[in-house]
Amino acid sequence: MSLFQVYARALQYLAVHKFRVGAIVIANIVLAAITIAEPILFGRIIDAISSQKDVAPMLLLWAGFGVFNTIAFVLVSREADRLAHGRRASLLTEAFGRIVSMPLSWHSQRGTSNALHTLLRACETLFGLWLEFMRQHLATAVALMLLIPTAFAMDVRLSLILVVLGAAYVMISKVVMSRTKEGQAAVEGHYHTVFSHVSDSISNVSVVHSYNRIEAETRELKKFTQRLLSAQYPVLDWWALASGLNRIASTISMMAILVIGTVLVQRGELGVGEVIAFIGFANLLIGRLDQMKAFATQIFEARAKLEDFFQLEDSVQDREEPADAGELKGVVGEVEFRDISFDFANSAQGVRNVSFKAKAGQTIAIVGPTGAGKTTLVNLLQRVHEPKHGQILIDGVDIATVTRKSLRRSIATVFQDAGLMNRSIGENIRLGREDASLDEVMAAAEAAAASDFIEDRLNGYDTVVGERGNRLSGGERQRVAIARAILKNAPILVLDEATSALDVETEARVKDAIDALRKDRTTFIIAHRLSTVREADLVIFMDQGRVVEMGGFHELSQSNGRFAALLRASGILTDEDVRKSLTAA
């Protein structure tokens, strides 16, 4: 993207406040006009003093300009600050909502820390651009547009010096930006690396401590920061050189105005006041050009940060719901997969040609080795991923035609890692249903065999569980997650390795809760512990993304196939059981 495209898109985010921005634009035009008028008025005051005329009216006018300029600048700055701060907060909220809605595959490929870093840096960068646009950029642009024609109207010869000065600034900035474009992009890449390393180390601090990695991780961070500085220093050197060249051009221009102005005054071709006005113009131009250079530098540095954010925004908008998406209502729970295929990007993993039908209220167990596609299958059901081919129907309705929100309202999931947030136990359970009363939360906890350990804690349901629930044991976390699913009371239930983190005693306590939860619900169970799938109405054995075997638990256990072999390997089924079943057959 060009600098202009980056800047234009950054300003588009202000369109939601177009009337407030419009008022600030008008105020900036007025302020710019006053800025141009001041040197002219000052020159006329000098001429009046030289000719011993009455200067009181002009001094009062000059003072009035000064007072008005000060008050107007304060008001513009105040409104600009409020608008920029408010828009930054709303953009952060909007972008957060869109990013969180992206599929897990997107987050896995991009990296959580990368998306977070991109969002935060972009919001701060946009905030700076908005603020400077409303405070300085616009006023500077208007002042420059008014200054040049006003100067030419007064004297063409001195005006040409101002034009040459402006051209010198533009050429110097253009050369420096072309020389440092790749370097600045590299700097931004190094910032992402540093942020990712810090985020990764802190989020895995227990591993860092356990394996004595503190010094090693610190050394690694130092190495990344050194690479960042190695990329940053050449960019800074170029901009330092540009500042020096601009300063030389400014000094030469000022000297030229003084020398030529003196000669013209001595010849009687120009008044002293006009030379003073041009000196004021030159100072004004130098100041405004310095602001424009700073503005160009700001946009140049912002481009690397914002291009990544704009790409992120575009990828998120591509996933927005179609306008004609319907609502999934009154779900009974009949689920059908019709020839579903899906592949992860840059990977051979996925699912291929999966077809089956589950009646309402049935329990479907999905088993198979790691990487077989079990979790992918239930993620497709929840539209975490979109299938490349085929249809998934709930009660005969293609889920691709309904909103994700209404679809997921009909599905409750208990994850393998519980998925608790750093909030209170009560708030984590209420994720199932935000408007639930405390009595309903407590009833759900009781049904999940979680009320005992919750009430034993000092703050009870107000106990904050820590990041990812690290202040609770694995079994406690899982029971809170089950309580959350109970509270949601959805017609379709997904248990993704829901009991894998539990010991035998706790699993026995939770089994009753899960059995109660499964009642009258279509339930999908993903499990490595095959003992948990005995009561399944339908068992789907998957391998390498394909359905290898499908049938009832007893049917498959007696078929001497892959599922039966897995049962024998886990000790649930013995060779004697197989012989008996074959004899009975």
Swiss-Prot record:
Annotated positions binding ATP: G368, P369, T370, G371, A372, G373, K374, T375
Residues of the ABC transporter domain: 335-569
Keyword vocabulary terms for this entry: ATP-binding, Cell inner membrane, Cell membrane, Membrane, Nucleotide-binding, Sugar transport, Translocase, Transmembrane, Transmembrane helix, Transport
Coiled-coil regions listed in the entry: none
Topological category with respect to the lipid bilayer: Multi-pass membrane protein
Enzyme class: translocase
Domain (ABC transmembrane type-1): residue spans on this chain: 21-301
Lineage: superkingdom: Bacteria
Compartments it resides in: Cell inner membrane
Record PROSITE patterns: ABC_TM1F (PS50929), ABC_TRANSPORTER_1 (PS00211), ABC_TRANSPORTER_2 (PS50893), NDVA (PS51317)
Reaction equations catalysed: [(1->2)-beta-D-glucosyl](n)(in) + ATP + H2O = [(1->2)-beta-D-glucosyl](n)(out) + ADP + phosphate + H(+)
A single GO cellular-component term on record: plasma membrane
UniProt-listed SMART domains: AAA (SM00382)
A molecular function (GO) term: ABC-type beta-glucan transporter activity
InterPro entries referenced in this protein's UniProt entry, alphabetically: AAA+_ATPase, ABC1_TM_dom, ABC1_TM_sf, ABC_transporter-like_ATP-bd, ABC_transporter-like_CS, NdvA, P-loop_NTPase, Type_1_exporter
Keyword Kinase: no
Transmembrane portions of the chain: 22-42, 55-75, 136-156, 158-178, 245-265, 269-289
E.C. designation(s): 7.5.2.3
Role played: Involved in beta-(1-->2)glucan export which is required for nodulation of legume roots. May be involved in other classes of oligosaccharides export. Transmembrane domains (TMD) form a pore in the inner membrane and the ATP-binding domain (NBD) is responsible for energy generation.
Family classification: Belongs to the ABC transporter superfamily. Beta-(1-->2)glucan exporter (TC 3.A.1.108.1) family.
Oligomeric form and interacting partners: Homodimer.
Domain comment as written in the entry: In NdvA the ATP-binding domain (NBD) and the transmembrane domain (TMD) are fused.
Name of the featured protein: Beta-(1-->2)glucan export ATP-binding/permease protein NdvA
Source organism: Rhizobium meliloti (strain 1021)
